[in-house]
Amino acid sequence: VADHKAIATGAAHSDEESVQSAMQLVSEINEEVNRQLEERIRIYEQKILPALRQQHIIFYQSRNVEPFHKEFLRSFFREEIFPYLSPVPVSKDKVISFLRDNRLYLAIRLYPKGDKGTEGQANKGRTPQYFVMKLPYSKVPRFIELPKHGKNYYLMFIEDIIKANIDTIFPGYDVDSSYCIKISRDADILIDESANTSEIIEQVKSKVKKRKIGAVCRFVYDRAMPDDFLDFLVDAFRINRQELVPGDKHLNMEDLRHLPNPNNAVRPIRKPQPMKLTCLDERESIFR
């Protein structure tokens, strides 16, 4: 995909016909990605969550929880999550933070306490500050099991626990809002076809090492993020707007395969069957 984008944007020298073809292909790819994203959200909200509820598994979808869980969340956050959080300031044209490939971050907008701004108008005239904070997956699971209540089991996203306690991270600020973001970096390996075998090996070694620090080829963000918030991040991280992909509130939904099964009511599929693609004729080769 990155190769076609390079042609479409003129980064790679190509004739006009190749550029137009690449632009059309990139557009079709983006449309398909967005279609699949919408379908995934629909399946999650209309099938997975109701199925969990039928098995007495309540999966909180926001920072708002039942009163009997509030003290647990405060304690869990303070003891298990807070020690691993490292907010990094984002300052356009002054500080450029490096976002790691395929990692979830929380983008946060806040205002210094004492900055009154325009009287009678919330946040108007106040100077916002921005931070990003990587979710500590290597230290804490993405999905947290909360204490059982009655016959129900409860689960929660780690990012929602952080949002519920975010004021304690920034005691000198009024937190305005926070949203999940994620970037994907260019992982394509383009090889000089004229190189000999030894040169190709060295090219591959060099390019593999750089895959995690390659150029940003996709910036996924919570579609509920206000336009001015998104504009700031795009400018601060120097994101090409063609790489923007609106997502849902919770990103990296492939992590659902690690969802806890507290009452063993959800039967895991040990040998998942491949999906049948009706658009392909099994009698013909797709390479013809």
Where would I find each of the regions flagged by the language model?
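N-terminal localization/anchoring segments of enzymes in phospholipid and broader phosphate metabolism
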Residues: 1-288
